[in-house]
């Protein structure tokens, strides 16, 4: 409601501890065929609007993991140390399991593509790209359930301060990513 996702198909994602994606389905409580949940988006005296809901369990918590490992001092340092390319380093940020659409609490994170040339900048880039990839996968699931592509994504939350993450998100989605103040 706060990001003005009033039309059917409007989508938003909050990048906090996790990443939480919602897409307006209008006045119809649409049931997902692909592992998403259905929620009430808002209710007024005049109407009830519904949304599809999907989650990525580890977003800012994956960044906190980088600080716990001593690879960055804080989330604010990410963009300053990130490498221009991951050089093949890949990260699946399932540090707390996988949420929608897999629902696998037993899933573990995966880091691959490391070499002696890998730096902390490559690891930071891989974590950010891994978060963006999970959100992009969710958007594909949303589009399948909605029967139409989602044309833009409105975002908020602490991680939206990372220009690198937001650019990775836009690149993977190939739609505008509109950052709302957090």
PLM region spans:
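Active-site core segments that coordinate phosphate-bearing ligands/cofactors
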Residues: 1-182
């Amino acid at each position: 409601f706060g990001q003005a996702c009033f039309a059917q198909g409007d989508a938003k994602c909050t990048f906090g501890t996790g990443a939480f994606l919602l897409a307006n389905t209008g006045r119809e409580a649409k049931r997902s065929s692909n592992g998403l949940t259905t929620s009430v988006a808002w209710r007024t005296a005049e109407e009830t609007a519904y949304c599809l809901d999907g989650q990525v369990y580890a977003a800012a918590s994956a960044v906190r993991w980088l600080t716990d490992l001593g690879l960055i001092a804080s989330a604010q340092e990410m963009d300053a140390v990130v490498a221009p390319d991951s050089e093949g380093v890949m990260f699946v940020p399932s540090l707390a399991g996988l949420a929608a659409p897999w629902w696998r609490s037993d899933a573990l994170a995966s880091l691959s593509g490391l070499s002696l040339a890998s730096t902390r900048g490559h690891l930071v880039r891989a974590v950010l790209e891994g978060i963006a990839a999970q959100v992009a996968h969710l958007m594909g699931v949303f589009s399948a359930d909605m029967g139409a592509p989602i044309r833009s994504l409105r975002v908020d939350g602490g991680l939206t301060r990372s220009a690198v993450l937001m650019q990775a998100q836009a690149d993977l989605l190939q739609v505008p990513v509109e950052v709302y103040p957090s």
